[in-house]
């Protein structure tokens, strides 16, 4: 049993050390630089379901980009809305596509519907960006996001971050977004590895969308489509500095539901796609695809920490009662040590504010809650577009 405990602990140690490696590598990341005047014609798609409260400021931020105005347009998809999303978006200066197909709900289906219409135009755009309706884009977002495509990439991903409203809960979640959506993709870029799509702040060339139609409809459609592209040999490139920010969920309950969608969705994709990715990696002898499989297998950070702590505790008990040898705890100790080192190193690499460090005082409670959420995470199968609770505006 000592060997079994050590082997399982070694897997968790590998997960922790892998993330620590990415955090260290992130120090070497440099954002893409302009090599000339922009040339790509871009349509920015904004899928929106009942977002009348926030769609106006999103469109305004996109209309204020430093990218040449004649080269881009903002198109809002008012998807199965029961409020005034479409009217607010038009008043803010966006073109609007209204979709009423209640039998085919979901962000992925809305994107496929709109992309098909864009590509059917006589003069389709060179590239299509996707921005969430509750986001605010930094002025240089689009200009920075397009640079990888100007350099020959076929898809790109910017930084999808959260606003820190000053509360401890928001600071904690904003810090987590820094790690997942800035540090890890930056580290992977430095190591020559592809970037996972994050759902918000994505960009695709017209050719990619024609050759690889959007057929990702799960709660984590971004990760699902990432895998489809990677298996097709297309590597999304990270565009650090192309920032879109969204508000944190306004309540603990809303945050819990949001995390369930994201984390449960990732576990569901891992269950259904890990075998395909591994098979593709070995068939093509592709080490990058093997890394993608490993990254897909890494549990969400809170769950990873909870499981590592539990494994360490159980191993320590087994040693204490003489059931396990003392050396069995070594890999578990490595795992439990690598995780906080990853967080602190990642915060430093990301230039995290002091509030992110202070918010770590919430980590023990967060980890305990993760243990209680394991059954729900494993059962998660949501495919409908579940809108996050807002402080204002109608909800579904």
Indicate residue ranges for each PLM-predicted region:
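N-proximal low-complexity "stem/linker" segments adjacent to membrane-targeting elements
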Residues: 1-60
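Membrane-embedded multi-pass helical conduit in multi-pass membrane proteins
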Residues: 24-28, 34-36, 295-380
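Cell-envelope/extracellular polymer assembly enzymes that use nucleotide-activated donors
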Residues: 40-43, 73, 224
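Acidic helix N-cap motif at the loop->helix transition within catalytic regions
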Residues: 56, 83-91, 98, 140
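Short, acidic, metal-binding catalytic loop of nucleotide-sugar glycosyltransferases
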Residues: 60-71
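A conserved acidic beta->alpha catalytic loop
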Residues: 78-86, 101-103, 136
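Long helical/loop segments within the catalytic core of UDP-sugar-dependent glycosyltransferases
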Residues: 98-100, 104-123, 139-218, 260, ...
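Short beta-strand-to-loop acidic/aromatic patch adjacent to the donor-nucleotide binding site
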Residues: 122-136
């Amino acid at each position: 049993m000592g060997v079994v405990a050590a082997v399982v602990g070694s897997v968790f140690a590998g997960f922790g050390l892998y993330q620590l490696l990415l955090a260290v590598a992130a120090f070497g990341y440099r954002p893409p630089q302009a090599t000339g005047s922009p040339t790509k014609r871009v349509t920015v798609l904004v899928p929106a379901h009942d977002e009348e409260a926030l769609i106006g400021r999103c469109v305004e931020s996109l209309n204020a980009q430093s990218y040449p105005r004649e080269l881009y347009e903002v198109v809002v998809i008012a998807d199965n809305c029961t409020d005034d999303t479409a009217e607010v978006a038009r008043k803010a200066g966006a073109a609007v596509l209204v979709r009423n197909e209640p039998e085919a709900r979901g962000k992925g289906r809305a994107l496929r519907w709109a992309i098909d219409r864009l590509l059917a135009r006589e003069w389709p755009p060179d590239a299509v960006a996707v921005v969430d309706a509750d986001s605010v884009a930094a002025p240089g977002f689009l200009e920075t996001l397009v640079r990888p495509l100007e350099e020959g990439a076929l898809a790109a991903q910017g930084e999808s971050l959260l606003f820190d409203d000053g509360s401890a809960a928001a600071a904690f979640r904003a810090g987590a977004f820094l790690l997942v959506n800035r540090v890890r993709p930056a580290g992977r870029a430095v190591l020559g590895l592809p970037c996972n799509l994050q759902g918000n702040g994505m960009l695709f060339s017209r050719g990619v969308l024609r050759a690889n139609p959007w057929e990702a409809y799960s709660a984590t459609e971004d990760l699902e489509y990432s895998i489809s592209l990677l298996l097709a040999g297309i590597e999304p490139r990270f565009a650090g500095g192309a920032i879109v920010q969204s508000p944190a969920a306004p309540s603990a309950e809303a945050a819990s539901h949001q995390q369930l969608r994201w984390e449960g969705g990732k576990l569901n994709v891992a269950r259904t796609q890990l075998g395909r990715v591994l098979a593709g990696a070995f068939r093509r002898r592709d080490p990058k695809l093997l890394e993608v499989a490993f990254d897909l297998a890494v549990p969400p950070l809170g769950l990873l920490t909870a499981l590592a702590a539990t494994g360490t505790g159980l191993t320590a008990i087994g040693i204490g009662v003489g059931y396990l040898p003392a050396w069995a705890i070594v890999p578990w100790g490595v795992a439990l040590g690598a995780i906080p080192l990853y967080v602190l190193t990642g915060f430093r690499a990301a230039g995290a504010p002091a509030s992110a460090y202070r918010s770590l005082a919430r980590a023990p409670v967060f980890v305990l809650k993760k243990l209680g959420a394991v059954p729900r995470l494993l059962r998660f199968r949501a495919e409908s577009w579940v809108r996050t609770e807002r402080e204002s505006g109608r909800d579904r």
